[in-house]
Amino acid sequence: MAKSYSNKSLWIVILFFCVFSGCEVRELSSSNESDAEVLSERKIRASSEKQNSHVYIGTGSVQGVYFPIGGVICRLLNRKTYIHRIRCTLESTGGSVYNLRQLREDNFDIVFAQSDWQFNAYEGISTFEKDKPNPNLRAVFALEADPLALIVRQDSEIESFDDLQNRVVSFGYARALQNRIIDDLLKVKKWTSKNFKQIKRINDNQQISEVCSSNVDAVLLLSSSLNDHLKDLDEGCKLKFIAIEGAEVDELVKSKPYYRKSYFSKGEFLDSPKKVSSFGLGATFVAQESTSPKVIYHVVKEVVENFNDFKSLHPSLKKLNKKELPFAGISVPLHPGAIRYYEEIGLLK
């Protein structure tokens, strides 16, 4: 039976753990108080509690993945407050772009950011063009990957990405994230729309039904969305993943370090008989260079020393590889506090 997970139920469990281990949770943008008021209150709170250092983590929406993972990190850190005198507070936010801007303004100590937004903020490009580059952005560690899911019917003759030539495909609607990612790969492969019989622009919530109905030969989704799109899969529709791998993927990941390789495990989401390779973006944990090296050191230390527990508390963390923490999807320099710990345990030399 293919595996699937409910993010909603999982964050409730993580929140339960967080509350009973003493980590604080705060939600921004409530109807009663502005973000500025919340951030101001937080600074007052921190200055009034002299005995502990405080670390404030910006996550994402309560229904998303970053929030429960942030809860796990705070839980691990707060279990040892009596030793390192660091207290962790978790806050829900609007996501990567908001987090990176607030981090630069010193309103957070560490934030979650999608790997491409991390790169864009550091370089001052795309959405961050008006913000200008942030040369002081530093990486703490890599988190879960979000690989592309290329899906075809189980009886399809398509066995590789190159088999998509002269086929009807959908890479999602025009502004879909997976569409932007696959465009980068097509440029490396020197493919254009002429390599396909037709490229349809189908909304993500319709893609699975379209491939099941044979209206398209293949569809492309993000692994992070598969639970939602496969939960009502008709029993008569058998699907499989197609690997996205090879020299062109290697070249792309090397030239654009915010991309990373990943895979779908045997039986993950679909009844795949074997592991299927892919690539995509990922989540990263980042700070400013000015963030306390002591805080960053202990954050990394608690995650690594409790790595199996950390991975077990959210399905998206299951495939994390300790050796990839300083590297996967990381396109900015590592924070000195993280470097210190990675060197101590031999992950960096």
Regions from the language model: what does each represent?
Residues 44-114, 120:
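N-terminal (or domain-start) structured segment
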Residues 206, 213-214, 223-241, 252-254, ...:
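An extracytoplasmic/periplasmic, membrane-proximal ligand-sensing/linker region
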Residues 2-11:
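Bacterial N-terminal signal peptides that target proteins for export
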Residues 105-145, 224-228:
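Acidic, polar ligand-binding/catalytic clefts
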Residues 28-58, 158-168, 336, 343-344, ...:
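Immediate post-signal peptide segment of exported/extracytoplasmic ligand-binding proteins
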Residues 52-80, 86, 146-213, 308, ...:
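Bilobed "Venus flytrap"/periplasmic-binding protein-like clamshell domains
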Residues 115-117, 125-127, 156, 193-286, ...:
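Pocket-lining segment of extracytoplasmic ligand-binding domains
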Residues 24-26:
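Bacterial signal peptide processing site
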